Amino acid sequence: MGRVGVLLLNLGGPDKLEDVGPFLFNLFSDPEIIRLPFRWLQKPLAWFIASRRTKTSQENYKQIGGGSPLRRITEAQGEALKEQLHDLGQEANIYVGMRYWHPYTEEAIALLTQDNLDNLVILPLYPQFSISTSGSSFRLLERLWQEDPKLQRLDYTVIPSWYKEPCYLQAMAELISQEVDQFPDPDQVHVFFSAHGVPKSYVEEAGDPYQQEIEECTALIMQTLNRPNPHTLAYQSRVGPVEWLQPYTEDALKELGAQGVKDLVVVPISFVSEHIETLQEIDIEYREIAEEAGIHNFRRVAAPNTHPVFIRALANLVIDALNKPSFKLSQAAQIKKMVKMYPPESWEWGMTSSAEVWNGRIAMLGFIALIIELVTGQGLLHMIGLLQ
C-alpha cells in the first residue's frame, strides 16, 4: 500500500485572546457560514460582524482559560490515532488541518505533499455531515486539488460522515453512562442531546442532511445505551435574526424545568473535542439557564477527546476506507450540488410568500450595505454626497 497519511479536519479555534478577532473574521468570511447572494459583500460583512463580536467572544474565552483547547486536543487525538493504527498493523502519518485557524488546512496539505504519500484518508472530525462544517472543508480541498497537479496524482479517499460507526456509538454510550450513574436514581435522569444548530434554510432550502443525521445519531446512541431514560434533542449556538433548527437548547431546558425535570445530563452530540461550545456555552450559560428553570442536578457528558473506544472508532474508519473503493472530493461535492446561495424560485408579484422572501432578502442586503458604509465611511451614498 505504500506510505499512508490521514488528514484530520476540524474547525480550529483561537489559541489566545489576541487571536479571537482574526479567527472570527476567517469564520464569517466563509460563504458556507454566512450565505450571501453577492460574493463582494462577504469580506466587509465578515469584518463588521467580527469587529462587533470580538470583545464579547474574548470575554467568553477568558472564562475557559483565555483560548481554545481544540488544537491541543485534536493533535492529541492524532497522536492516539497513530498509535492505535500501529497496534492494528497500519502505519500512517497524521496531519491536522483546521478550517479557520492554525494549523490551517493549507498548511497540512503543504506538509503532506512533501512526504510523498501513496495513499491519503481525509477524515473530518465531524460525525455528522453539514455544508457548514465538513462541506466547507471539502469545498476548500476541492479547490486545492484543482490547483495542484501533485495532489491530483495522489490516491486519496474521503469519509463524508461516520455517525453510525459502532465504536463511536459505544464510546458515546459509555460516556453517558458514566454521568448518569452519578445520580441516585439513574434511570430517571433526562438525557439531553445538544447539537450545534444551523439555519433552518440550510436544511429546508439547501438540502443539508445535517438534521436527519443528527436525529439518526441520537436514536442510535440511545439504542446503544440501552437504558430507559427519557431523552430530548435540541440545537445550540444560534446567532443572528434568522430561524435556526429547533427546539433551541435554552428553550428546551426551560420547558423541561417547567415539566418538573430535576436531574439532567447534557450530551454534546456534534462535538468530539472540548471547546468553547462545551466549556463555556453548555457548562456555564446553559447550566445557569437550567438551574434557573428548576433543574437542580445538571451534569455534562465529556466530549470523546482521546477516549480509547473513540480512538478505535477513528482507526476503524481509516482502515475501512483504505480497503474500500475510493470516495472522491467530487463525489462529496455531489452532496452540495443541491446547495445554492438561494434556491431557484419563480418571482411572483403581489402579497405572496415568494415575493415576501425576495423582499426580505433585498431589504437585508440594503441594510447590510448601509451598515458597512456607515462603519467604513465608503460607498455609493458617500460617492453621491448623501452621506459625508
UniProtKB/Swiss-Prot annotation:
Gene3D superfamilies: 3.40.50.1400
Function: Catalyzes the ferrous insertion into protoporphyrin IX.
GO cellular component, one term: cytoplasm
Major enzyme class: lyase
Keyword Lyase found: yes
Family: Belongs to the ferrochelatase family.
Name of the gene encoding the protein in the UniProt record: hemH
Keywords on record: Cytoplasm, Heme biosynthesis, Iron, Lyase, Metal-binding, Porphyrin biosynthesis
Lineage of the organism: Bacteria, Bacillati, Cyanobacteriota, Cyanophyceae, Nostocales
UniProt keyword annotation of Iron present: yes
Entry binding sites for Fe cation: H196, E277
Annotated compartments: Cytoplasm
Pathways involved: Porphyrin-containing compound metabolism; protoheme biosynthesis; protoheme from protoporphyrin-IX: step 1/1
Protein name in UniProt: Ferrochelatase
Domain of life: Bacteria
Catalytic reactions of this protein: heme b + 2 H(+) = protoporphyrin IX + Fe(2+)
A GO molecular-function annotation: ferrochelatase activity
Xref: PROSITE patterns: FERROCHELATASE
Entry EC number(s): 4.98.1.1
InterPro entries, per the entry: Ferrochelatase (IPR001015), Ferrochelatase_AS (IPR019772), Ferrochelatase_C (IPR033644), Ferrochelatase_N (IPR033659)
